[in-house]
Amino acid sequence: MLRKLVTGALAAALLLSGQSNAQNACQQTQQLSGGRTINNKNETGNGNGNYKYEIWRDGNGGSLTLYPKDAAFKASWNNSGDFLGRVGLTFNKPAATNLGGDLIANYNYKKSGSDGGTYSYIGIYGWMDNPQIEYYVVDDWMHNRGAPGGSYMGSQKGTITVDGGTYKVWSGQRTGASKWGTSTFTQIFSIRTSPRQCGSINVSEHFRQWQKLGLRLGGLMEAQLLAESGGGSGYVDFTYATITIGGSSSNASAPSNNNNNNNNNNDNNGNWNNWNNNNNNNNNNNNNNNNNNNNQGGGNCAAIWGQCGGSGYNGPKCCKQGSCKQINQWYSQCQ
């Protein structure tokens, strides 16, 4: 995801806790109140304890309420284009799988609204360095189009089982805006096949499973609970949220490699072409159609709902159907 306001500050101390039980998180339903609200601006800063926060919006309305308890927050948006709210920990680039204990996120939230038919993520998000990696663990989303997935995420590397759930793992290369300006970096996604609104994410176990699939990791810069939407109006309200180090590792099955070419395409009966969004326009090395053909008659032009432009994008810039509409500076779509 494109982030202009992210800091790489080191957490002053790593939090230790044994609260890694999903059942406990799902029992934390009391509505929170109070705290501080940031309205209609892009900002990063310090939250409770060692937690850091960020709100980022690409126009129009959005707010982030920081509750006076742990990493709990409420993110709200109103036709704000790309919007995100996130709270979590930052690190000084230790090896992702050598943190002195497992990195565990516990959460419970309510949600309402939609992503405007584009894209949305709820889960864990962060960056690594050397190599540059943007990563997601997605447990839920704001739409009813099925689990995210498709060639815009790169290629499917396999499936893993973590915290009692099955995740499809995708990875690809992207060139565009990043924490380092404009650069080429790797994206890694764990997409849960059955969404949930409470539980525990053993982030460290995802890291280990990614390595078993042959993915190279870097030094950890951040791990934060995320609510992101590419449009529409709605909110995600975390009534309980902690990110700790020191929990025990969850039981995880060995990853299953996936070399089926069909999995590199839309795996939701065609419903996911319109999820090819501004944050995940991978310049995928497996996509031979990524060229600068401007032939408006078709040929290598993008299909309906496909990407046709944006900062850092090197693919087709014409549409087989409809016309190319700019969504924001990073993403234009055939509509």
From Swiss-Prot:
Chain positions carrying an annotated carbohydrate: 42, 78, 202, 251
EC number, as in UniProt: 3.2.1.8
Keyword field: Carbohydrate metabolism, Glycoprotein, Glycosidase, Hydrolase, Polysaccharide degradation, Secreted, Signal, Xylan degradation
Stored InterPro entries: CBD_sf, Cellulose-bd_dom_fun, ConA-like_dom_sf, GH11/12, GH11_AS_1, GH11_dom, Glyco_hydro_11
Entry's localization field: Secreted
Signal peptide: 1-22
Biophysicochemical property: pH dependence: Optimum pH is 6.0.
Protein function: Endo-1,4-beta-xylanase involved in the hydrolysis of xylan, a major structural heterogeneous polysaccharide found in plant biomass representing the second most abundant polysaccharide in the biosphere, after cellulose.
UniProt organism field: Neocallimastix patriciarum (Rumen fungus)
UniProt-recorded name of the protein: Endo-1,4-beta-xylanase S20
